[in-house]
A protein has these predicted regions:
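Terminal alpha-helical segments
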Residues: 1-134
Length: 134
């Protein structure tokens, strides 16, 4: 168990949340909101793995990582959000049609939903691990 490394993951996750707060109302950057949301959730899940002494894989899929921690943390999340995070993760890194939702870039409303989901997961994991991040 490494509470220190778990805390480092969560500090990095908070940086993603703060980045989202700066860009979440810009319609041009909604795909970047999704990217930072995905990064936040990925880091939160890896914090749980670190805290519980499990090997942290070189894996980016929030769905796969959630499968590894869902019995550890009581998270109330919709799997569809994790699917969207995984689908949109590529879009922020590559041009073209890769990583877009079926209807294209996320809307501003969807961007806010991604932020809310990431914030909920971050806060829940912090409480579960008894780690405070300022």
């Amino acid at each position: 168990m490494s509470k220190e490394l778990a805390q480092e993951w969560l500090v990095s996750a908070l940086a993603d949340l703060k980045s989202i707060q700066y860009i979440m109302n810009d319609a041009f950057l909604t795909h970047m909101v999704a990217f930072h949301g995905q990064q936040c959730v990925e880091k939160c899940f890896k914090a749980v793995l670190e805290y519980t002494g499990k090997r942290v894989p070189k894996e980016h899929s929030t769905l796969k990582l959630y499968g590894m921690i869902k019995d550890q943390v009581p998270l109330d999340i919709e799997i569809d959000v994790l699917t969207d995070f995984d689908d949109l993760y590529i879009d922020a890194r590559y041009p073209g049609e890769f990583g877009l939702l079926p209807d294209g870039k996320p809307t501003l409303g969807e961007a806010h939903e991604f932020f809310d989901a990431a914030m909920h997961i971050f806060e829940t994991v912090c409480v579960y691990l008894d780690i405070q991040i300022d």
